[in-house]
UniProtKB/Swiss-Prot annotation:
Organism of provenance: Streptomyces coelicolor (strain ATCC BAA-471 / A3(2) / M145)
Function, in words: Catalyzes the condensation of pyruvate and acetyl-coenzyme A to form (R)-citramalate.
Keywords annotated in UniProt: Amino-acid biosynthesis, Branched-chain amino acid biosynthesis, Isoleucine biosynthesis, Transferase
SUPFAM superfamilies registered for this protein in UniProt: 2-isopropylmalate synthase LeuA, allosteric (dimerisation) domain, Aldolase
Protein name: (R)-citramalate synthase
Top class in the EC scheme: transferase
Biological process, per Gene Ontology: isoleucine biosynthetic process; L-leucine biosynthetic process
Length: 534
């Protein structure tokens, strides 16, 4: 189904993640993936979702067929992508044009050549025939009741080479009935001032409704998109998280946030901007790429503060070091705990974790010194909030949080004659007055330790059954001891509803891993509401 947007038609947010974004190296979308992303984008509230090129490959053809049946679009209209008719043919008889109509999409994007050299060398036809191809295809699709957008490929490079011909393609498309003519910086080499000047000139000379499609090869795709809007473009083409071929496309999320929060344009349905961070991360999950922590607006570090001076100011007024309220885009402010942290950082971090330090300057001072001491030894709490919370609670309560007492542990790796390895770990500990000895095998010494600790504790604490180790990172810290260098391990653990990170540091990677595992299980029990042992 195709939605009817609650917004007027004066400005378009057009997403091309499913076509252009899918060209990113490392992204391989199934039909199910494309359907899932389409649902997320519709939920976000974009006006148009370009689904792919029906007829060009079976996957895109299947996507359009299934999307019509399986998705009840609330906000977006589904768009089919294709090219103008072949040179010397008739649009009404062109198989590729027919496939666009057969897709059922009520909106169609046509890619057209606007660079004279591309017409002559790639299409191998004349400049006049290229204009006829544009006019014939647009007119035919409009006669079939379709809305038509025309992407002028390589427009800005073509404009520099032959401005009159590039403008004639725009004029031809518009006069044939194209609803929007999109100027594409296909090679991504333009800068904002250049984009703004060209868009303004083309708008004045042709009177066409213009859009912008910017690639990010100079790192300017978002800026170029906004520069085009400044010059009068009313249609922006973007991809979720900036996915796209080579280095990517204009990132949907910074563009939309800038339009809504900086330009004051309502380009999404009411309230949808607050879903932006969630949608960004959900789409990253579908394409199986880790969300960029430093992505504007939606990255976990977008509103993270580390320096003590910043924290002191934020304690007085968050706006002093933040350009917007993070909640406007569904994100949160985070205080990073490091050796740069001062008292204000610790107090704010405690508040974030739900620990009221009550203005206890002595306690806060102890925590500051403890953090600096630990980071000097190689620990990092910026990425290990759970370990920091355990440290903070230990200082506040005067003793570590204990659910179990470890007597000893060991991990053994055996090399076998056939070249295989056997990994076994044994843990001896006390929990609720009971001495427990547990042994387990794993696909590595750390996995064996994790399993043996789980075996030892699950009978006492069944809450641990739902914990999963989801990420494991090892870093050899700088030093002069070679194989004796200090090792830092970061472990991420999930209980199905949330995720937390813990850290361990030791000269031995297994010992560092054990520390992080102990913290992970301790925090998991704390998170589950289990009371610690007396």
């Amino acid at each position: 189904m195709t939605a009817t947007s609650e917004l007027d038609d004066s400005f378009h947010v057009f997403d091309t993640t499913l076509r252009d974004g899918a060209q990113r190296e490392g992204i391989n979308l199934t039909v199910a993936d494309k359907l899932a992303i389409a649902r997320h984008l519709d939920d976000f509230g974009v006006g148009f979702i370009e689904g792919g090129w029906p007829g060009a490959n079976p996957r895109d053809t299947e996507f359009f067929a299934r999307a019509r049946q399986e998705i009840d679009f609330k906000h977006a209209q589904l768009v089919a992508f294709g090219s103008t008719r072949r040179a010397g043919a008739n649009a009404a008889e062109d198989h590729q044009v027919k496939a666009l109509l057969d897709s059922g999409a009520q909106v169609i994007t046509l890619v057209a050549k606007s660079h004279d050299r591309h017409v002559e060398l790639a299409l191998r036809t004349t400049l006049d025939e290229n204009l006829a191809m544009v006019a014939d295809t647009v007119s035919h699709l409009k006669a079939q009741g379709r809305r038509v957008f025309v992407d002028c490929e390589h427009f800005f490079d073509g404009y520099r080479a032959n401005p009159e011909y590039a403008k004639s393609v725009v004029r031809t498309a518009s006069e044939a009935g194209a609803d929007v003519v999109v100027l594409c910086d296909t090679n991504g080499g333009m800068l904002p001032a250049q984009i703004q000047a060209v868009v303004a000139t083309v708008l004045a000379d042709t009177g066409a409704r213009l859009g912008i499609h910017a690639q990010d090869d100079t790192g300017c795709a978002v800026a170029n998109t906004l520069a085009a809007v400044d010059a009068g473009a009313t249609h922006v083409q973007c991809t979720a998280n900036g996915y796209g071929e080579r280095v990517g496309n204009a990132n949907l999320f910074p563009v939309v946030a800038a339009l809504e929060l900086k330009y004051g344009k309502q380009v999404l349905p009411e309230g949808r901007l607050r879903e932006m961070t969630r949608i960004s991360h959900a789409i990253a999950e579908v394409v199986n790429l880790t969300p960029s922590t430093h992505q504007p607006y939606v990255g976990v570090s977008a509103f993270a503060h580390k320096a003590g001076l910043h924290a002191s100011a934020i304690k007085v007024d968050p706006d002093l070091y933040q350009h917007i309220d993070p909640e406007l885009v569904g994100n949160t402010m985070r205080m990073l705990v490091s050796d740069m942290a001062g008292r204000a950082s610790i107090e704010l971090k405690g508040k974030e974790l739900g620990i009221d330090l009550g203005g206890d300057r002595e306690l806060v001072g102890r925590v500051v010194e403890r953090v600096k001491e630990r980071e000097l030894a190689g620990y990092t709490y910026e990425a290990a909030d759970a370990s920091f919370e355990l440290l903070l609670r230990a200082e506040a309560e005067g003793r570590p949080l204990k659910y179990f007492e470890v007597e000893s542990w060991r991990a053994i790796t055996e090399d076998r004659p056939d070249g295989s390895h056997a990994n076994e770990a044994t843990v001896k500990l006390w929990a609720k007055g009971e001495r427990i000895v547990a042994t387990a095998e794993g696909n590595g010494p750390v996995n064996a330790l994790d399993r043996s600790l789980r075996v030892a504790l699950e009978k006492i604490y069944p809450e641990l059954a739902k914990l999963d180790l989801v990420d494991y990172k090892v870093r050899i810290l700088e030093g002069v001891h070679g194989t004796q260098s200090t090792t830092r391990v970061l472990i991420s653990t999930s209980d199905g509803t949330g995720e937390w990170a813990t850290v361990g540091v030791a000269e031995n990677v297994i010992a560092a891993s054990w520390q992080a595992l102990e913290d992970a299980y301790t925090y998991g029990l704390l998170r589950a509401g289990v009371a610690p042992a007396e």
